[in-house]
Amino acid sequence: MKHLDSLEAESIHILRETAAQFRKPVLMYSIGKDSSVLLHLARKAFYPSRPPFPFLHIDTTWKFHEMIAFRDKRVAEEGVDLIVHTNRAGVEAGVSPFTHGAAYTDIMKTQALREALTQGGFDGVIGGARRDEEKSRAKERVFSFRDAHHRWDPKNQRPELWNTYNGRVGKGESVRVFPLSNWTELDIWLYILRESIPVVPLYLAKPRPVVERDGALIMVDDNRLPLEPGETPQTRWVRFRTLGCYPLTGAIESRAASLPEIIAEMLVARTSERQGRLIDQDQAASMEMKKQEGYF
C-alpha cells in the first residue's frame, strides 16, 4: 500500500498549504465517498486539533435520505463546523428535477454554491473532485483559479511545478483546491478499507425499490418521485458508485455488499463511475460548461 501512503502525504500537504495560504478556506462536503476521505484526511492533517475551516454542504432538498442522516451523524461524531446552504428562492419557486430539467442543476447547485461562497467570503474552496472522474476534471489544476464570478477558465490557470501552489487571489477571486486530484476511484476504496472510514450505506448493495427510466435505475427514495405510465417499482439488488440528488442518480445492479467486494468489482469495471449521473449526459462537454459557470 505504499502508493496510498504517497497519496495520503500529498493530500495532507495540500490541505495544510490551503490552511496556510488562504484567509478564509472552506471544505465542500457533499457526503459521498470522496468527501468522507477528505474529512478523514483533514482530521489527520491537523490532529490533534480539529480542521481550522468549516465544512459546507449545498443541500438541494433532493438528496437521498440516507445521505442526510449520514451527514448529521458524522458531523456530530467529528465535531466539525458544518454550514448547510440551500437556494431558498429556488425552493420557493418550486424548482425540482422533474419540472426544470437541466436548469435545476444550475439553480439548486451552481447558483446555490456561488451564493454560499459569496456570502461566506471564502477564498480557498476545498473539494473532492478527482482527475480520473471526468475529462474536464482531468485537465484541472490542484489549485484551480476562479474569477470574481466563481467562473473557471481552463486557459487562465497557473503552472504547478514541483508541487508548488500559488494561492494568491484578488478581491472577490477564489481558488478551488482539489487534494484528491491524483487519486483514482480504486485508490479511494482501498484507502477507505485500510483506514476503516465510514461511508453512506447506499454504496453497498442490497435489495432496493427502483424504476428503470431512460436506461437508468432510479431508486424510489420517497413519494415525490412521479411514476410514469406503466412504471412499477421493482425490488432489485443495486448499489451506487456515485451519489447526488436521487432522481438524477442511477444505481448499478450489484451484489457487492462489503468493501472487499466493491474493490473486486472495481478491478474489472470498464465504465466511469459518473455513468450514473444524469446531469453529465444532457449535452456534449456538459461538465466543462457547468464548471465554467461555477459548478463544483
From Swiss-Prot:
InterPro entries: PAPS_reduct_dom (IPR002500), Rossmann-like_a/b/a_fold (IPR014729), SO4_adenylTrfase_ssu (IPR011784), Sulfate_adenylyltrnsfr_sub2 (IPR050128). Pathway: Sulfur metabolism; hydrogen sulfide biosynthesis; sulfite from sulfate: step 1/3. GO terms for molecular function: ATP binding; sulfate adenylyltransferase (ATP) activity. GO terms for biological process: hydrogen sulfide biosynthetic process; sulfate assimilation. It catalyses: sulfate + ATP + H(+) = adenosine 5'-phosphosulfate + diphosphate. SUPFAM superfamilies: Adenine nucleotide alpha hydrolases-like. It is an enzyme of class 2 (transferase). It holds the Pfam family PAPS_reduct. It comes from the Bacteria. Transmembrane segments: none annotated. Keywords: ATP-binding, Nucleotide-binding, Nucleotidyltransferase, Transferase. Its EC number is 2.7.7.4. With CysN forms the ATP sulfurylase (ATPS) that catalyzes the adenylation of sulfate producing adenosine 5'-phosphosulfate (APS) and diphosphate, the first enzymatic step in sulfur assimilation pathway. APS synthesis involves the formation of a high-energy phosphoric-sulfuric acid anhydride bond driven by GTP hydrolysis by CysN coupled to ATP hydrolysis by CysD. Heterodimer composed of CysD, the smaller subunit, and CysN. Belongs to the PAPS reductase family. CysD subfamily. This is Sulfate adenylyltransferase subunit 2. The lineage of its organism: Bacteria, Pseudomonadati, Pseudomonadota, Alphaproteobacteria, Rhodospirillales. The gene is cysD.
